[in-house]
UniProtKB/Swiss-Prot annotation:
Lineage: Eukaryota, Fungi, Dikarya, Ascomycota, Saccharomycotina
Localization in the cell: Nucleus
Family indicated by similarity: Belongs to the HIR3 family.
Family annotation (InterPro entries): Hir3/CABIN1
Organism name: Eremothecium gossypii (strain ATCC 10895 / CBS 109.51 / FGSC 9923 / NRRL Y-1056) (Yeast)
Superkingdom as given in the UniProt entry: Eukaryota
Name of the protein this chain belongs to: Histone transcription regulator 3 homolog
Annotated GO MF terms: DNA binding; nucleosome binding; transcription corepressor activity
């Protein structure tokens, strides 16, 4: 094949050519498929035709891209596409004509639309023929689309422009063209309302009128035309929205009507699209109200007929039988708070499951006594407490049914009303309860806020007396509601029309002159809905009023009033935001937009003439608007009020407009106007004073507050004219204005924390409010008025009480400074408490009665308000009860108060709201109980802690109740106070260290307290930082003889200072000390079960360190700190020997051990100082003596561990400070200074012995029945090591005493072996050194025969017998000790037996056999020495013993020349290096012994058999012979010694990076394996004949041969040396590779 490529040809061109060719083939294939489709279509085989069309349009050239475009275009392709789409459209048309009877109308329409789609697609590729345009024209006629008909006609007429010349000659046109022109004329006539184009005008002027008969449509298209007519008729029908009404009321209509449109945030009403209807998905063309799935008219008529037939009934009965439940939430999403808080019923308000009457009665009888028990228990204690203070109650709390309240009781009527409110609570009651609520809290008020409150009174809606309620809208007859519904349903009104009609009914003036929005009381949902309608339609209604002012001026005035009320709400919220420091920029924007709207309305309404009530409504609304936007100093306000007053006086009408629904618009009557006028004048006076004396603004405000306080309290000190003027103003002011003034005064005293004046004012206003409820004026009101008065008064009581609680609980003090009037105040609080008591009793009644719904479940939000008030009043009741007890000096007043608080807690906790009012009651109870000394408050406190913190102090869980309180976070001041109480209660002056029981209850609390306190910032307190420095300086000091002496004398001192911060008291009380005791006890328990971790000690050390740094001078803390360090050292030394092998790690451990010794010395020092403390009781002195003895013991033991192995006195070493030395040459050098001992060995010995002796002697002065055997045991050991021969005088008596004490301390399962072993060994050593005769030693051993249990003759010794008989008896006793070891942990007797056998009997085999028990030479265990640490073995001594045993065992094996066992030992010791001290020395010794033994036993010479042999070997021959040797290797052909030596040496070489084992391993391989194999096969290998073992003995120099020149490959070799020198050398690695394979077969 030729590789020629033309210069003008590229691969891309080839690809294009191939693609073009492929496209041509596709076109051919398309035409073939198209012809086949036409063939099937002509034969009316529609399924086959459809398949072919589907195949046709799947061909690539007919498929457009995602955008509907085609990649390639050509005349052929355009024609193909036109024909394909055209004929597929025809196919669909023919199919639907043939199957029109079988298809439903939807399928017919779908197919016709496919026809249109394909035909229109065909027109995009080529000009359509007459058949296409004719078919499209018929289809468009069927769809009755004139525009499409006109388009297709114009398309057909303009398709050939040359035919335009023939338009003037009618006879020259073909009939088809004439038909098109006539059709075009007809279409233009039908669409004559549209402008005619220039072309159409020319056609109409040129063509002669020639009426042609209209051809009828085919049946299929005629059916389409019919369907089109049906659709048009259907579209003309209005879409009816059915609105379901739950009841027939304006509220329900408004609520359901508002739900038709999307919910709107309040801010959206000020946007460009304020109407939420604009956001609706579908238009609401027609609204129809329905109720219970039947027309509303029928329902209305039925209810009206029933209403006319029966008598009117009381509102209470209606409320009881069908209460309207509160609904939570607000539609006003743009504001921070809803203007009218409402509530939703909880899930528990669902109808209860029906049960039989018999079951209900039986359940009620059974549970009634149990239900009333909480009230009976509380009442009994309550009466007992009030009786102590000689307060007589006129009512029985245990049975407080409404019918049981005495009619003579002062609060009889308000209590009945309270019960009625609870029973029939509705959203109306919620409105009453929230009427007096104010936004913001006192905590957010700054200085000077009181004066601002004075001026802000003008913007309050609570001006008038009582704000007397008017008739409720729901109480009006149903007639108007029915008429409205009938009008809407009969006229089929649009959404806008219904909304406008509703606004007209509710906002316009009625024929009798009344207006529903101003003269009736609405529910919050109704007013909120109307307000949203007003904000949505404000612009449209403005245009309506502007155009038809006389007709709609009442509606416009109502709109303006609603807008002004909304503006007042925004002003109020802005004020609240300013007080709380919140952001109010959005509210400012809303205010500005709303003011612009109102200004436009005011200008419009100013042009209208109002008469009658409308006139006064307009004047009053302008005044309210002016009041919002102006300051109190604005004269327009006074002028406006004067004008209104003048008009009211001159009016013949009695003007009294309630404005019940306007929260920020006051009632309009003469009394209101005059009150407002006088109030403004007074406020102007205050404001003018502020403006004239700006420099004394604060003082003048305070003077005004003080004057106002004197006036309100009613003091007679009204000397100045200003005071008298203010008094007149206050006396004439309405009640709620006085309440506002009271609030200002109380806020002021709260801000300055003046408890005395606040107390006077609080109880004065509380008395006024209570007397208001008990007055005749209250009883004379209607029930609805009484309920409003009651709930608003309770709300005021709650508000003032919460302020008082805030003042009393400041800094968590809960203290009443002035208790001189506590008894009188307590009586008033009792009256208020009884007034509120139905809140809890009603819940009990609701549980008794199946028809009564729980108030707490029915009205969740409102119940929270009343719960808070009940709890706050309970707190004051407790405080003033304790104050009254103090005032009257009641005996056991604290105990009675404790019971009273606990009873109150059980009462309110039983109803699950003891944590109400931000947990005030729980805070007070906790504060009081923690301040009580004694155990009376412990049980109540446990219940408080369970509720407040979910903190359980143990005990029987069933004895405490779960009140469902939300847990609070434990704060520091509470935590500290709680810890103080519990520490005093739990320990009661006992030392926590000596209490054996684990106070787990206190442990949890202590941990929580410490967690709350957190890590103490020592660096932030200069005293603590100083203490840290001196503390660390002491712990870094060396242990000297002086410091030990000073500790024993109590003369050590550290310059610590008490920081005296907020933690000093609790630390002095023992918080951190107790925590350290508990944590250390827990660590000990975990340590016994091997679960403790050393890291746990870090937190304990930090805890104890905190106690020391606060200078508590508690010697127990130093003692425990020393124990922590001892545990750290013990953990370092017990588990691995790394801390003993690595010098740096051992130095760290020694430093910690030195700290432990210093801590013990300081503990001993402080303990010595406390001995002479006269303030200590005898019990405390005994406790201190007990701890002092333990300090002696641990100090002595720590000194012992530090001095002897494995630490070997390292903690007593100190580094010499670096110094520069001048040498002889004049250079300054820093000499290497080795650490020097800080105390001599003799002093360590004397100190240790002295401390042990002191500890042992202290047992004589104590009453302990069991002494510590370790003290005499260690005393004896120390003396024996130091005194040696002198020890025998009295030393054995000490050992015998230790043995006797150990026997008493032993148990049947665990015998203490150590002192008995010590006795046996000391007797043995004394005899061996000649210090003691065998018979004398046996006498000492006889003293311990109760444990050794030998025959009497065993201890007899004939002087003629040899000493070895005595040694045999020693071995017998040692075996006896091993037998008594139940746990099999002791190993020293076994070692000593082996030692005696070897040293005294020269029995190497016996010694090896004994040591074999301790050694695991050939086991799979990696440890060579298999021993356990006995309980009383000193830390780290285990690794010393291991090293001792290993070295002795190696010595035994060396004496026996057992080099194989030495090799196994060396191999294991490489893996067991961390199990002993000096592991590397022991390993090197074992290796040395093995190598020497192998050399001697196997007669190998490493130089001869390895170093000199390797260079002489032929590489290829070595590999071949070695492979043959490995392949035919058989262990039976070699001795055990050779194979084991080879395996051991290779394994040692593999585990070592050195070359110590190379020679031995290679020598064994070549001498005993390789060379004998070569000698056996050298006869067959001539090339290797000159490599003889004997030639090596001739001192052949391989260097010379290696330097010889290589011979040519074809030249015969002339000498062996030349042959060797020319090949590759055999390396050690090559040899070891072969050896490894041999070793694998051996092992």
């Amino acid at each position: 094949m030729s590789l020629f490529t033309a210069l003008n040809s590229t691969p891309h061109d080839a690809l294009l050519e191939a693609e073009e060719h492929s496209r041509e083939l596709q076109v051919e294939e398309s035409f073939r498929v198209f012809q086949s489709a036409l063939f099937h279509l002509k034969a009316k085989r529609f399924d086959d035709a459809e398949a072919k069309f589907e195949q046709l349009f799947n061909i690539e050239v007919l498929k457009p891209d995602h955008w509907g475009l085609y990649r390639y275009s050509s005349p052929t392709l355009d024609l193909l596409r036109y024909l394909a789409y055209r004929n597929r459209g025809v196919f669909y048309y023919q199919y639907v004509r043939e199957h029109a009877e079988e298809l439903d109308k939807d399928d017919i329409v779908d197919y016709i639309l496919k026809v249109v789609e394909n035909l229109l697609q065909a027109l995009q590729h080529s000009d359509g023929d007459a058949a296409v345009t004719g078919l499209l024209l018929q289809v468009f006629r069927g769809f009755k689309s004139k525009r499409l008909q006109r388009w297709i006609l114009e398309y057909e007429l303009t398709k050939q422009p040359e035919e335009m010349l023939l338009l003037g000659r009618g006879r020259a046109l073909l009939p088809d063209t004439r038909g098109l022109v006539e059709e075009y004329r007809r279409v233009l006539r039908d669409v004559r309302s549209e402008p005619v184009t220039e072309f159409a005008a020319r056609v109409l002027t040129l063509v002669k009128t020639d009426s042609l008969e209209v051809q009828p449509l085919p049946p299929v298209l005629d059916k389409i035309e019919q369907l089109k007519d049906e659709d048009d008729a259907m579209m003309k029908q209005l879409a009816e929205y059915e609105v379901n009404l739950e009841e027939l009321s304006w509220e329900c209509i408004a609520e359901s009507f508002r739900s038709l449109v999307p919910k709107y945030k309040y801010t959206n009403f000020f946007s460009k699209a304020p109407d939420p209807y604009s956001e609706a998905g579908d238009p609401i063309e027609c609204i129809k109200f329905v109720h219970n799935d039947k027309p509303i008219e029928q329902e209305v008529m039925e209810q009206l007929s029933v209403q006319n037939e029966r008598e009117p009934f009381a509102a209470t009965q209606a409320a009881t039988e069908a209460p309207t439940l509160e609904k939570e939430g607000s539609e006003n999403g743009g504001r921070t708070e809803s203007k009218r808080d409402s509530e939703l019923p909880s899930d528990s308000q669902r109808p209860a499951q029906r049960s039989s009457k018999r079951f209900k009665e039986r359940s009620t009888e059974t549970n009634e006594a149990e239900l009333l028990r909480p009230h009976q228990d509380f009442a009994a204690l309550f009466y007992s407490c009030t009786g102590i203070l000689e307060v007589r109650l006129e009512i029985e709390l245990s049975h407080l049914n409404p019918e049981a309240i005495p009619s003579t009781y002062p609060a009889y009527m308000p209590m009945l009303d309270f019960y009625e409110c609870l029973n029939s609570w509705t959203s109306k009651h919620t409105e009453f309860l929230n009427q007096s609520e104010t936004k913001g809290t006192s905590k957010n008020k700054g200085k000077g806020e009181d004066s601002f409150q004075l001026t802000s009174l003008l913007r309050s809606s609570m001006f008038t007396e009582e704000n007397r309620p008017t008739i409720s809208l729901t109480e009006l007859p149903y007639k108007e509601v029915a008429e409205f519904i009938s009008t809407v349903n009969s006229n089929r009104l649009h959404f806008h029309a219904v909304r406008l009609l509703l606004l007209q009914v509710l906002l316009t003036v009625r024929p009798d002159g009344s207006c529903l929005i101003t003269d009736t009381f609405w529910s919050p949902i109704l007013y909120d809905t109307i307000e949203s309608f007003v904000l949505s339609l404000e612009s449209n209604i403005y245009d309506l009023v502007y155009s038809q002012s006389e007709k709609y001026k009442g509606l416009g005035l109502s709109f303006c009033e609603v807008l002004m009320n909304s503006l007042g709400g925004i002003y109020t919220e802005i004020h609240a935001k300013k007080i709380s420091g919140g952001k109010y920029g959005e509210l400012e924007a809303q205010k500005n937009k709303l003011e612009k709207k109102i200004d436009r309305w005011v200008l419009l309404l100013d042009q209208l003439v109002f008469e009658g009530k409308l006139k006064f409504r307009y004047l009053w609304s302008k005044f309210c608007y002016l009041q919002c936007i102006s300051d109190v100093t604005d004269d327009r306000i006074i002028h406006s009020l004067d004008y209104i007053t003048h008009e009211l006086r001159n009016s013949s009408m009695d003007i009294d407009i309630s404005y019940a629904n306007y929260e920020h618009t006051p009632r309009l009557n003469m009394e209101t106007v005059q009150s407002q006028l006088s109030k403004i004048k007074m406020m102007r006076k205050f404001t003018m004073v502020n403006q004239m004396d700006v420099d004394r603004n604060d003082s003048s405000n305070e003077d005004q507050i003080e004057a106002l306080s004197r006036v309100l309290v009613g003091t007679s000190l009204l000397d100045t004219p200003e005071d008298r003027s203010m008094s007149e103003f206050v006396n004439q002011a309405p009640f709620l204005l006085k309440i506002k003034l009271w609030r200002i005064v109380l806020h002021h005293y709260l801000a300055v924390k003046d408890q005395s004046n606040f107390q006077i004012c609080y109880f004065k206003v509380l008395h006024v409010l209570y007397e208001r409820l008990c007055s005749k004026e209250y009883s004379d009101q209607s029930q609805l008025q009484r309920q409003q008065t009651l709930l608003s008064t309770l709300s005021l009581m709650r508000s003032f009480t919460s302020l008082f609680i805030e003042l009393l609980s400041g800094a968590n003090e809960w203290v009443i400074n002035d208790t001189s009037q506590a008894s009188e105040y307590f009586k008033l609080l009792i009256d208020v408490f009884i007034l509120l008591y139905p809140l809890t009793y009603f819940e009990t009644l609701s549980q008794k009665s199946a028809t009564t719904v729980s108030f707490f479940k029915k009205a969740a939000k409102s119940s929270v308000i009343l719960k808070d008030m009940f709890v706050d009043i309970s707190c004051l009741l407790v405080l003033y009860f304790t104050g009254a007890c103090t005032q009257k000096e009641v005996v056991n007043g604290v105990e009675v108060a404790t019971e009273f608080i606990h009873a109150l807690h059980l009462l309110i906790g039983g109803f699950t709201f003891c944590d109400a009012a931000n947990g005030n009651f729980l805070n007070l109870a906790e504060h009081f109980f923690c301040s009580v000394e004694g155990s009376s408050s412990f049980i109540p406190l446990k219940q408080i802690l369970l509720c407040k913190y979910r903190l359980s102090l143990g005990g029987d869980a069933n004895s405490f109740e779960d009140h469902g309180a939300k847990p609070q976070v434990l704060e520091m001041h509470n935590a500290v106070r709680l810890a103080k109480y519990l520490i005093r209660f739990e320990y009661q002056n006992k030392n926590p260290y000596l209490i054996s029981t684990n106070r787990s209850n206190l442990k949890q609390v202590i941990e929580n307290v410490i967690d709350v306190i957190g890590k103490i910032p020592y660096a932030e307190n200069h005293i603590l930082a100083r203490n840290v420095y001196y503390f660390e300086q002491y712990l870094e000091a060396p242990v000297t003889a002086k410091i030990i002496q000073e500790a024993l004398q109590g003369c050590i001192s550290i310059e610590l200072t008490k920081p005296r911060d907020n933690l000093q008291e609790i630390v002095d009380l023992g918080l951190y000390y107790i925590s350290g005791v508990q944590l250390l006890n827990l660590y000990k328990v975990r340590k016994k079960t091997l679960q403790a971790r050393p890291s746990e000690l870090d937190s304990i050390i930090e805890t104890l360190k905190a106690d020391i740094l606060y200078k508590t001078n508690r010697f127990e803390t130093w003692f425990l700190l020393g124990k922590c360090y001892s545990y750290v050292v013990e953990d370092d030394l017990i588990w691995t020997s790394d801390r003993l092998v690595v010098a740096s790690k051992k130095a760290t451990t020694a430093s910690i051990q030195r700290k432990a010794i210093l801590c013990y010395l300081m503990a001993l020092n402080l303990c010595q100082l406390s001995v002479d403390d006269p303030s200590l009781s005898e019990a405390q002195k005994m406790e201190n003596a007990f701890i002092k003895r333990e300090i002696y013991e641990v100090l002595a033991l720590e000194l012992l561990n530090a001095y002897f192995k494995p630490m070997e006195g390292l903690p007593f070493q100190r580094d010499i400070a670096p110094a520069l030395v001048l040498t002889e040459t004049g250079e300054l050098v820093e000499p290497k200074n080795s650490p020097q001992p800080s105390i001599s060995s003799a002093n360590i010995y004397r100190a240790t012995l002295l401390v042990f002796t002191n500890a042992d002697e202290m047992y004589k002065d104590s009453q302990d029945a069991l002494q510590n055997w370790l003290n005499p045991h260690y005393i004896a050991n120390l003396r024996f090591k130091h005194e040696r021969e002198d020890f025998i005088t009295d030393g054995f008596d000490i050992i015998i005493r230790a043995c006797n004490l150990a026997m008493k301390a032993s148990t049947s399962n665990d015998n203490i072996i150590e002192p008995h072993y010590s006795l046996v060994i000391k007797c043995y050593k004394s005899v061996k050194h000649g210090w003691l005769r065998p018979e004398d030693a046996l006498k000492h051993l006889l003293n311990d025969n109760s444990f050794l249990a030998q025959e009497a003759n065993f201890y007899s010794h004939n002087p003629e017998n040899s000493v070895q008989d005595f040694y045999r008896k020693i071995i017998t006793l040692l075996r006896r000790l091993l037998a008594l070891d139940k746990r099999k942990w002791h190993h020293r007797p076994t070692y000593r037996i082996a030692r005696i056998l070897f040293d005294d009997f020269n029995d190497v085999d016996g010694a090896i056999q004994e040591m074999g028990v301790l050694m695991a030479l050939k086991s799979v265990n990696k440890n060579l020495v298999n021993i356990w640490k006995p309980e009383y073995e000193r830390p780290g001594k285990h690794f010393v013993y291991t090293y001792q045993y290993v070295m002795f065992y190696l010595k035994l094996l060396s004496h026996k020349n057992d080099y194989i066992s030495l090799g196994h030992a060396a191999r294991k010791m490489r893996r067991f290096g961390s199990g002993m001290v000096n592991g590397s020395l022991a390993t090197d010794k074992a290796v040395e012994m093995f190598i020497n033994g192998a050399r001697a036993a196997l007669g190998i010479n490493e130089k001869e058999h390895a170093e000199l042999l390797l260079p002489t070997l032929n590489y290829q021959a070595f590999n071949r012979y070695s492979d043959e040797l490995i392949a035919s290797f058989n262990k039976e052909n070699y001795s055990y010694e050779v194979l084991e030596s080879l395996a051991i040496s290779y394994q040692l070489k593999k585990g070592s990076s050195g070359i110590a084992f190379d020679g031995v391993c290679l020598s064994i391989y070549f001498k005993y394996l390789y060379l004998p194999w070569v000698e056996e096969h050298e006869a067959a290998e001539a090339t290797q004949s000159m490599v003889k073992f004997v030639e090596i003995n001739k001192n052949v120099n391989p260097t010379e041969n290696e330097t010889a020149s290589p011979q040519p490959a074809a030249e015969p070799q002339k000498s062996t040396t030349k042959q060797v020198s020319s090949r590759k050398r055999v390396s050690k690695k090559d040899a070891f590779d072969k050896i490894s394979q041999i070793v694998d077969k051996i092992t």
